[in-house]
């Protein structure tokens, strides 16, 4: 059976590229369904940990769960990572710390603990490496992966493997990752940023134009605000 739809909660699979008629998984009732006509054909993915440094700190300090958290240096430093609560105030990576604190005075600032981040990165990339050796890490918290030819070895098409990997990481580490699946690295990178956090987005040949046309040129990897003008 062709797999065109997958439930991200229970791993139910179905053949309809539109997903279940009512939008709910027939096995568990979840609405977290990934469905696409090319779902079982695409094999290039981009994996990106969600607000990685800040998420590690929040996991280790549950009392900060709903607080704005910034990981970075002192007042003269810059923001390494801002959690999603802090981002709602306009705080972003590489922002000078004094500007970040002006935008979000109640933020909890935590100095980076790279020993801890490297350890978690190795756990995540190690789990990804169990699927295929064709991994290209871009940093501690993101990587490209090519799952071509792994369907029989890993018990399902790349989309199924990656959704199962997402669940594994969340269950084992308490951290979440977002994944973009596409025919090439360029589109996979863009896809991974479309549904964060804890997202899974598919950009195939059939929907690439419709999905990308409304987005600004700065959404393209490597295109900054200056060049985008």
Where are these regions (language model features)?
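Gly/Gly-Pro- and Ser/Thr-rich, intrinsically disordered tail segments characteristic of DNA damage-repair
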Residues: 1-229
